[in-house]
Amino acid sequence: MSIALAFFILVLLGFSWASPSALDDTFNVSRSVGLISSSNLESCQSSPLEVGNIYNSTSASEILSTLDAKYITIIGVIGSSNSSIQDLIDSVGNSNNAASSNPTSTVTEYVDRVQTVTEYVTLSCGQAFTSTVDISSSTSSSVINSPTGTAVSSQISTLSMSPSSTPVFSPSASVSSKVASSVSYVSSEPSDSSSSTNTVILTTSVNSPAVSSSETLTSVSITSTESAYTSSSVDIAASTTASSTLPVSTSEATVSFSTDIPATPSTLSSPASSSSSYLVETSSTLTDSVFTTVTATSDSSVITYTLINSVTSSSETTNLPSSSSSLVTIGESSFPSSLLSLLTQSFSTVRSTSSSSTDQLTSASPISSSVISPSVSSPTSSILTNSGSIKSGDHQIVTTSFVQTTTHGSQVETLTYVTTLTETILTTTYDSHTFLTTITPSPSNSISYTNNTFIPSSSIKSSIVYSVTPTSAENYTSSEAFSTSSSLVVIPPVNSSLVTSSTSFTKFSSLSSSQLSTENFTSASSSLSLTNAKSSLSTPSTTIPTSNSSVSLQTSSSLIISSPIISSSLTATSTSTPALTHSITPSNTSYTSSLIPSSSTDYSSSLITVCSNVTSEISSTSLASLISTLTSQQISSNKSSEFVGQTTTEYTTSGSVGFTTTLATQSGSVPGTVLVDVPTPSWITETVTSGSVGFTTTIATPIGTTAGTVLVDIPTPSWVTETVTSGSIGFTTTIATPIGSTAGTVLVDVPTPSWVTETVTSGSVGFTTTIATPIGSTAGTVLVDIPTPSWVTETVTSGSVGFTTTIATPVGTTAGTVLVDIPTPSWVTETVTSGSVGFTTTIATPVGTTAGTVVVDVPTPSWVTETVTSGSVGFTTTIATPIGSTAGTVLVDIPTPSWVTETVTSGSVGFTTTIATPVGTTAGTVLVDIPTPSWVTETVTSGSVGFTTTIATPIGTTAGTVLVDIPTPSWVTETVTSGSVGFTTTIATPVGTTAGTVLVDIPTPSWVTETVTSGSVGFTTTIATPIGTTAGTVLVDIPQQHATTTTTTTFDGFSGYTSSYTGSITETIVIGTPHHSVVDVS
């Protein structure tokens, strides 16, 4: 009777990377599949297994309907029923997409996206087990199917099983992720046929930036007899127990447990004054995983280690003085006194059960002492790393690093390829048979170089060979070599065997299922077809007669195999006698397989093709299961991370062409090594090391683009980064700041010829600002690497070309540093410091223009500014007055050749007035920097040329200063002081005329004037008489009869407002004070 096993992998693809709380980069899968004994097979011979039964039940269909149809695909099937496979396809398609007219298209269309992994395993007599992990929602569920079709599901904290039948065995499956819950099933065969006990260890682990948590492990034991169903749960961390008993008539039994999620610290640490517990995974046998709790309790003098076996409940305790550095002996092993060293050096899997950490550590297996030399065609600068001693009966790992260095001018690029090869030799005794499993990888043809140029491995001639050779009437030996990172596996006849192996291997890339079309078994009497080209899946027959048969495989015209090859072989012995030879030669599309039977025994065989790239931890108890696991347990992922020894790797895929960059970080260190698996011509990387601690950031840029991806290999708690994208071409600059410091390093991912940067350090604390300017443009982006609370910046854009100036002011100071991102030839700046407190104002003027923008770096409470724009060309003048003083500094943004200014200081208090005259004109604008309540001014415009005279009188005085904005050759003034009180009168006469204008700077109550208009031409005479006297002075200033027009423009810092006053000779013109404008620096 043949064995029927069915593995279905339903893959839900598509990662989301839209926010910082995106998925963690770790996704490890390990699985152990048990063997159905021959006695159990006898009990099932009367009722052949039907794969379709799993899906034909109502409840199972309901469960499948909850899965989104567009994420489902079937990669491989092994079965004994001709009709059940099509039933399976119909059931899955109909359950997930009722509206689909072609279910087979539905289940095979979306093979390239992975986010949910569902595994179906057919047990004896039709039982099925399903384990589902949804990475995106951090949930997991389990389903156990009985032969009657009853299906029960669970979500993380609940395990449901049907007591109506006793499983012969349960597969041990473990799916773990830092963002998804992990459920581990450890099974044991019943001692008799009337009862069965299944022990389940459920692990909840969530490690996300948005969620703080730890792992909680609960052991659930489920015992089923003919009359009762008993379940008990033990919380390993809390040492609490709960149990319940249900009659067999109960349709469902549910065992629930709570998950305790305490706060999550950032790193593992040695035990302090409190107790710390870790769960370590060992193997007491070759088939069962044993979780052992290691607890370390320490005080000032003693460290106590306690190991508790979760299966046997046995414990061992060892005390050690805390000051001792010797090893601790527990059982047959010696451990160092450091708990962290104990775990990482002695156990394969370490998980925390306390609040100390949720990190999983995977220790490196012993290293092989044999030397693997680089191939003769490898570059001269090759480095061979990781060599050591081999431990009997264990793994031997050899890691080879090929380093290629290329020089382009002054730039040196380094490309590193790392290949990890694992050998495993295990011997297992089962009943009276001895089985030997050997996994031997080979680095040959892994990487080929010609003149230091990487050659894709698709051009390397290689083969996959699967051979079965009879060794005697009762045994045969099989071997398989995995090459080109994909597997084409033929399952040999296995009637009753047990082969155990455990290995860890990496497949860097492989064929996608869309590149495979049809694989055929052909013989004289029957044929088997398996199509993976998004069309159909059918199995007309699985019986191959005793005569020789041939196998052919048709593929697409091109096989894309662009990654290094890792080859390994499997050797096992079993009791079957036929011999099967299968060979593949990638150089052509012809594949042949021949069967050399030694008896007339019928058997079932299927062809499975799986394409993926992931690292898997595999444990198997049969040759068929081992091969199936190696092929079906592959998971395609755009972004994944695994633990290889004590090295953490992170994969990032960038751009539409799918280039991939890998960062490898040794445990216990912060800097990592960047491993780029794309040849130099396709991927440019630049690495910058910052700070004394040697933090490293690497930027990878695909050839032909100007923007790259910044890869930072330091965790968030240690390294703060800020990325700014500038301009329409998307150049990207990243600033990395070590925690605890205020200054960072700017990392620019574009070569110097394309991106010009200028860095300015300001102040004694060393704050740093960098301006990045794309080549060919005059405006850049200012990047400030200090958080807002420590550094205040204000950016002003001036003119139509968009020149930009930024002022950075450290918090707690009033003066800042002006950072200008345009080179000196394009941007003229002038900075004036005013007052004893060192307030600073800067004017920036684009080259080729006469007007600039005044940038003031002091907040409103400390600095009052008033800006006036004069003339049609928009000249701008700004007066800055420190708060608490009456005198300010006039800042003029036009060079001397374009703008003539004259400043007069009046009185003992130092009030200042400035007149600004554009070059080429005779009239200017008087700018007064004191508000009206402190400084009284009167301005008179005289004559057709618009000459202007202004008198400024300090408050509290009766005499003022006449400020004339025309040089002496154009404007004659005469000032007369009258009386003992020092009243002052000034007459202003335009050059070339005999009459002037009387300017009186004393209000009417102090100075009496009388004006008489004489004659037909309207000449005007004014007599001024000081108060208290009877005689006055006649001041005559009659201009020609022309109307006067005065224009005032007020500039509020952003817009100019202009008003004009036109009147007759005798009309009084009132000139309003320009709007008061304040520059608010925020």
Swiss-Prot record:
Region (11 X 36 AA approximate tandem repeats) residue spans: 720-1043
Sequence repeat boundaries on the chain: 646-681, 682-717, 718-753, 754-789, 790-825, 826-861, 862-897, 898-933, 934-969, 970-1005, 1006-1041
Cellular location(s): Cell surface
Disordered as annotated region, ranges: 353-374
Signal peptide: 1-18
InterPro entries: S_pombe_Mam3/Map4
The entry's keywords: Conjugation, Glycoprotein, Repeat, Signal
Cellular component GO terms, alphabetical: cytoplasm; external side of fungal-type cell wall
Glycosylation sites: 28, 56, 82, 451, 475, 495, 520, 548, 588, 613, 638
Superkingdom, taxonomy of origin: Eukaryota
Listed GO biological process terms: conjugation with cellular fusion; flocculation
Similarity comment: Belongs to the mam3/map4 family.
Known function: M cell-type specific protein involved in agglutination during conjugation.
Stated name of the protein: M cell-type agglutination protein mam3
Record lineage: Eukaryota, Fungi, Dikarya, Ascomycota, Taphrinomycotina
